Amino acid sequence: MGTSNTQKPQKQVPKRKKYKNLFSLKTKKKRGKKFSKRKKGGTLTLPVIPPKSIFILLKSRNKKIYDRKIIDYKNRSLLQEYIYFTGKIIPKRKTGITTKQQRYLTKAIKTARILGLLPFVKKEKGFFR
């Protein structure tokens, strides 16, 4: 008279990943680090776009900006971090900064080059006698 539940517990099969095509298996690559390996000590310092007013900088207390540097053409140490040894500007995809920051950085680097603060090309041994 009693109805008993005699169902067997089903095994849980792990779901397989579905790929759209066979080529996607071969083309998957691991992406490298966004920061260049030029420095032995650590990563690049993140730049900050200069505010139009100093009051804007003081109001934003919730953002941690103490470890960042403001983009300026006079700040050689910051600008040299975003330039290769050959003198080329490091692209945005390698540094991991935003498009707006890259634009400001490029303008600052070009201004510093014109004023003679940064070199246009690398210094070769045979060039300077």
Curated annotation (Swiss-Prot):
Keyword Ribosomal protein appears in the UniProt entry: yes
Any Gene Ontology CC annotation: mitochondrial small ribosomal subunit
Highest taxon of the lineage: Eukaryota
SUPFAM superfamilies hit by this protein: Ribosomal protein S18 (SSF46911)
Protein's cellular compartments: Plastid, Chloroplast
One example of a Gene Ontology biological process annotation: translation
A UniProt-annotated Pfam family: Ribosomal_S18
Ranges where the record places region Disordered: 1-20
Keyword set, alphabetical order: Chloroplast, Plastid, Ribonucleoprotein, Ribosomal protein, RNA-binding, rRNA-binding
GO molecular function, one term: structural constituent of ribosome
HAMAP family with a match to the protein in the record: Ribosomal_bS18 (MF_00270)
Family the entry assigns: Belongs to the bacterial ribosomal protein bS18 family.
Record-linked PANTHER family: 30S RIBOSOMAL PROTEIN S18 (PTHR13479), SMALL RIBOSOMAL SUBUNIT PROTEIN BS18M (PTHR13479:SF40)
Binding partners and assembly: Part of the 30S ribosomal subunit.
UniProt protein name: Small ribosomal subunit protein bS18c
Gene designation per UniProt: rps18
